[in-house]
Amino acid sequence: MVKELVERIRQKDQRAMSQFYQQYVDELSSVCYRYVPFEDDAKDVLQNSFVKIFTSLPTFDYRSEEALRGWMRRVVASEALLYLRERKRLLFVEQTAEVKELADADEPQADLISPDTLHQMISELSVGYRTVINLYVFEGYSHKQIADLLGITESTSASQLYFAKRILARRIKELTNSKR
């Protein structure tokens, strides 16, 4: 079914494009909002992503729907990062010895809260923390790949992830303690 849809898009079938868009817009929107939480900006990024997907689809080597979905998620993530870089919203905090370290906590206990609550907590992180945690945890990038993609050092990527996890662990702990 999906393979036939891709073939029809390659032949510039407008109905196939519309059907494809409807089939994947929700999934790709959620990827987009992880990086760009502002609705108007996210809509722009998503639109640019679909343009890129539709123009690149003729050369995409379709092997499976899973591979297609992974590729589209990477396109959206790349477009979101490009958008943030162009607008200088992607700020990273270099951690130094002078930075007051957060209390060392275990890994965030994400299983204690709902996925929606976790998503909300991640969206409230600073852009740098949020971007690195999304790329590392949800997209599976290594610190080297993140560093290359964002133009930062591997240690900055690792530091951003460390502090993002500490903040999330603290917030989860506060939330679960307040419910007792």
What are these regions (language model features)?
Residues M1-E27, P58, S123, K144-Q145, ...:
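N-terminal module of bacterial RNA polymerase sigma factors
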Residues V2, L82, R89-L118:
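Internal acidic/polar
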Residues R10-Q11, F50-E65, R87-K88:
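Sigma70-family region 2
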Residues Q22-D26, R34-Y35, N134-Y141:
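Short helix-capping/turn signature of helix-turn-helix
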Residues T59, R73-E94, F163:
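Arg/Lys-rich amphipathic alpha helix in sigma70-family domain 2
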